[in-house]
Amino acid sequence: IYDRRVSSSIAGHIASAINGAAIARDTSFLKDSMDSPIAADTITLVDDPLRPRGLGSSPFDGEGLARQRRVMVENGVLKGWFLDLASARQLGLAPTGNARRGAGSPPSPGTTNWIMEPGDVSRDELIASIEEGFLVTEMIGSSVSLITGDYSRGASGFWIKGGEIQGPVTEATIAGNLKDMLMQITPANDLDFTRSTIAPSLRIDGMTVAGA
């Protein structure tokens, strides 16, 4: 289980994989996945630049185009790319108002308020449903390939046994492939709107845990 303090990293990996610049460069494991299931049907992801008081809210993107709320993944099915003018031109598509401009750098596609919608069960219910597993509360380092989806990260947290939290775990490694991981996600209902990229606590089955 990814606690909501760290689950936004999964949403971030999805955003990077559907970034138009990565699609145009042919460097994303989701490059051929438009209108196809990429995640469990419990997963919907929305980019909402018009959310009131959202940390990433703005009416116009870094190239002056009007922004709009976009459902990017709907019930697990990929519905769109994040595009600026350059990546849209390379892909022969219309820009989507997702250009972000940094100080001294050219515009590039990016998210605004990137939200993985909550599920129907509580975090405690997710924990109680696990016979043996790992509650991840902190991530340490990263080895994630957006080309292949291969995923390996250091993590710490707590061991779960018989649906109950046991002792602490430090310096473990969790590994899998994002293609498989996304298909095995169950979201909790504990979404917390405190950042511009947010996700609820997530149960992901079938991952490898070493060093716990």
What are the roles of these predicted feature ranges?
Residues 1-34:
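Active-site pocket-lining segments that scaffold enzyme catalytic pockets across diverse folds
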Residues 7, 31-212:
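Dual-mode signal for accessory low-complexity, basic/Gly-rich regions
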